[in-house]
């Protein structure tokens, strides 16, 4: 049974405008990335050949996950409580910790499905939570 559904779309240029353009070292100072990404995700962001696209997709996925939880970001759920990674086949997956994990339990959720897509100007994500 579906216990939560969330979707989000992000304009990649908007994210790109918030990323320092002075090279790889400047990525280490990106405040938006530090606020949104976990340590593991941040390391991948810094090493990415397309950091704005990477951050936009992670931002959309985390917003979609928070919407599926019914809280959005805030009210006990932060960006740091939601981690986006890839399974062995390369498919995106979402892991909930702390407040996000507690909210998932309150909903009776046991499985999260995540789809991320991007094209030239936009990144989008959808999360479905199942009991």
From Swiss-Prot:
Lineage top rank: taxon: Bacteria
GO-annotated cellular components: cytoplasm
Reactions that this protein is recorded to catalyse: apo-[ACP] + CoA = holo-[ACP] + adenosine 3',5'-bisphosphate + H(+)
EC number: 2.7.8.7
Record-level Gene Ontology MF annotations: holo-[acyl-carrier-protein] synthase activity; magnesium ion binding
Keywords: Cytoplasm, Fatty acid biosynthesis, Fatty acid metabolism, Lipid biosynthesis, Lipid metabolism, Magnesium, Metal-binding, Transferase
Subcellular location(s) of the protein: Cytoplasm
SUPFAM superfamilies named in the record: 4'-phosphopantetheinyl transferase (SSF56214)
EC class of the enzyme, as a word: transferase
Residues that, per the record, bind Mg(2+): 8, 63
GO biological processes: fatty acid biosynthetic process
Function: Transfers the 4'-phosphopantetheine moiety from coenzyme A to a Ser of acyl-carrier-protein.
Family indicated by similarity: Belongs to the P-Pant transferase superfamily. AcpS family.
Designated name of the protein: Holo-[acyl-carrier-protein] synthase
């Amino acid at each position: 049974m579906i216990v939560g559904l969330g979707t989000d779309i992000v304009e990649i240029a908007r994210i790109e405008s918030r990323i320092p353009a002075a090279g790889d070292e400047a990525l280490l100072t990106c405040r938006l990335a530090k606020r949104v990404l976990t340590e593991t995700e941040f390391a991948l962001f810094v090493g990415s050949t397309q950091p704005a696209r990477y951050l936009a997709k992670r931002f959309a996925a985390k917003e979609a996950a928070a919407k599926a939880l019914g809280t959005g970001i805030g009210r006990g759920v932060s960006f740091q409580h939601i981690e986006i990674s890839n399974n062995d086949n390369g498919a995106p997956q979402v892991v909930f910790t702390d407040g996000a994990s507690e909210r998932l339990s309150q909903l009776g959720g046991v499985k999260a499905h995540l789809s991320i897509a991007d094209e030239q100007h936009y990144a989008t994500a959808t999360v479905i939570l199942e009991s």
